Amino acid sequence: MKILMIEDNVSVCTMTEMFFFKEGFEAEFVHDGLEGYQRFTEENWDLIILDIMLPSMDGVTICRKIRETSTVPIIMLTAKDTESDQVIGFEMGADDYVTKPFSPLTLVARIKAVIRRYKATGKAVIDEDMIETECFTINKKTREVLLNGEPVENLTPKEFDLLYYLVQNPRQVFSREQLLEQVWGYQFYGDERTVDVHIKRLRKKLASEDKPFLYTVWGVGYKFDED
């Protein structure tokens, strides 16, 4: 297992490295946020461990940027035992969190649990231009969508972008505000009901007797799920 740990506390990294070695994990440790994100983009990793408080770029920002292109499992580290930090991490796409100070054995156990869940949930296979799941093949370059091998016709540009983003992040719940930011862009100042309208249209175009695909999470937002 290839792990990238972005943590500015050298002592924590040194202690953790010994336990990773015993488990047979291949780990790289980076102590700067911006440098750590750069390392993420340069290689393929099986798991990312992120401290929230980092120089140059904080862990929450790194997590959000990673989730723009990847479903790699992410564990957040925080020195603050507060619910707000945990919620922010989960909202940005983290899979789990560990509160400092922690036992390396606890971190190893969390890593194994996250990897088990990751393998069991059938995350999307993603590269720069293509997403392939059990039911969908989505080509970002040609903007083509296949559902069970059949083309999905007449998607508007924003419908395609919204579907691509949700399929890229399976089972992750997004608020309307988050979807406006991620799909329409930070410069978009429209009504949040715009998201509802696009979801409704997508559901009609993806109509399936077996699976709804796009689910409403009442009081929160929407998620994509093939189960």
UniProtKB/Swiss-Prot annotation:
Gene3D superfamilies: 3.40.50.2300, 6.10.250.690, Winged helix-like DNA-binding domain superfamily/Winged helix DNA-binding domain. GO terms for molecular function: phosphorelay response regulator activity; transcription cis-regulatory region binding. Phosphorylated by YclK. The modification 4-aspartylphosphate is found at residue 51. One of its GO terms (biological process) is regulation of DNA-templated transcription. It comes from the Bacteria. The keyword Cytoplasm applies. It is found in: Cytoplasm. Pfam families: Response_reg, Trans_reg_C. InterPro entries: CheY-like_superfamily, OmpR/PhoB-type_DNA-bd, Sig_transdc_resp-reg_C-effctor, Sig_transdc_resp-reg_receiver, WalR-like, WH-like_DNA-bd_sf. Keywords: Cytoplasm, DNA-binding, Phosphoprotein, Transcription, Transcription regulation, Two-component regulatory system. Coiled coil: none annotated. Residues 128-226 bind DNA. Residues 2-115 form the Response regulatory domain. SMART domains: REC, Trans_reg_C. Could be member of the two-component regulatory system YclK/YclJ. PANTHER family: DNA-BINDING DUAL MASTER TRANSCRIPTIONAL REGULATOR RPAA, REGULATOR OF RPOS. This is Uncharacterized transcriptional regulatory protein YclJ.
